[in-house]
Amino acid sequence: MISDIEFALSECNFQFAYKDLQKINLYIKRILLLNTRFNLISNSNSNFNSILNLHVIDSLLGLPTIKEANPSEILDVGSGAGFPGIILAIFDSSRKYYLLERSKKKSTFLKMIKLELDLENVKILEYEIEREKKKYEFITIRAFRSMNEYALVLKNLLKNEGLIMAYKGKFDRINLEVNQIKDLFSKIEVKSLSSKLSAERNLVLLYK
């Protein structure tokens, strides 16, 4: 299985250490083992290669943007099974990641994974986003919901000149969402990304 991870990362030109491969391998195995108990991902994608390509590789597509912005801390909203927060934290270990997940089941899983993978740069926040008072330079969210459902709430958690990075799907669905929230932000940028293994992905960057 580690060889599959190494191949996938190499195909997408991601830099990695062997310890990163070991952590990803264990992480995927834990999701497969505990998915039914914690309701982590769709059953239709609950096999090793689907998790690797649709979730792990997809999560990593945002890492270059994070490194370019170079924030000291990142808030990942609605972390669920840990995508993208856990994946980013594994490959970006010098940065602090706060994973906010309101579901007790999923946050329990995240706490288990944090300990098992020894992710000292991760902190799990188990509550509704409205309770969060800290301000962040950078926020990530990977959600199927329309951006107008969460844009204002997330903007209020940004420091001045902060940035929200929203993982979104097909480009033709994004324009309507962007038009609904364009007056909230000083600048909105759409980055079209692709890899040989993941589905179509666009990053929507919302600047305060």
Curated annotation (Swiss-Prot):
GO terms for molecular function: rRNA (guanine-N7-)-methyltransferase activity. It is found in: Cytoplasm. The keyword rRNA processing applies. S-adenosyl-L-methionine binds at G78, F83, E101, R102, S103, I129, E130, R142. GO terms for cellular component: cytosol. It comes from the Bacteria. Its EC number is 2.1.1.-. Keywords: Cytoplasm, Methyltransferase, rRNA processing, S-adenosyl-L-methionine, Transferase. Disulfide bonds: none annotated. Belongs to the methyltransferase superfamily. RNA methyltransferase RsmG family. Specifically methylates the N7 position of a guanine in 16S rRNA. This is Ribosomal RNA small subunit methyltransferase G. It comes from Borreliella afzelii (strain PKo).
